[in-house]
From Swiss-Prot:
GO cellular component: bacterial nucleoid; cytosol
A GO term, aspect molecular function: DNA binding
Compartments where found: Cytoplasm, Nucleoid
Keyword vocabulary terms for this entry: Cytoplasm, DNA-binding
Name of this protein: Nucleoid-associated protein VIBHAR_03086
Family under the similarity heading: Belongs to the YbaB/EbfC family.
Function as written in the Swiss-Prot or TrEMBL entry: Binds to DNA and alters its conformation. May be involved in regulation of gene expression, nucleoid organization and DNA protection.
Record InterPro entries: YbaB-like_sf (IPR036894), YbaB/EbfC (IPR004401)
Listed Pfam families: YbaB_DNA_bd
Species whose genome carries this gene: Vibrio campbellii (strain ATCC BAA-1116)
Domain of life: Bacteria
Length: 109
């Protein structure tokens, strides 16, 4: 089934992929991504592990109603979270060689 040394090479490749995956996970956890709403009037910066680092609110919004501001903050956070997911997919594809995963399955398993 496997040629001479084939299984050893396969195991070596799997270990290398696992090492790259671990480094990539650390890189993703430490990256920062900024999401925006209200044409940039509200910005939320989060890490790759979805911890909020910073919330920036344009002063012009301080006079508007509280409910609208809350909606803009939520929208900015959701935008940042979406950007983290997109970045994770792109970076993981570079490690997995574009290997497609079943729907709903995320790496790491």
């Amino acid at each position: 089934m496997f040629g001479k040394g084939g299984m050893g090479n396969l195991m070596k490749q799997a270990q290398q992929m696992q090492d790259r995956m671990q480094k990539l996970q650390e890189e993703i956890a430490n990256m920062e991504v900024t999401g925006e709403s209200g044409a940039g009037l509200v910005k939320v910066t989060i890490t790759g592990s979805h911890s909020v680092r910073r919330v920036e609110i344009d002063e012009s919004l301080m006079e508007d109603d509280k409910e609208m501001l809350e909606d803009l903050i939520a929208a900015a956070f959701n935008d940042a979270a979406r950007r983290v997911e997109e970045t994770q997919k792109e970076k993981m594809a570079s490690v997995t060689g574009g290997m497609q995963l079943p729907p709903g399955m995320k790496m790491p398993f």
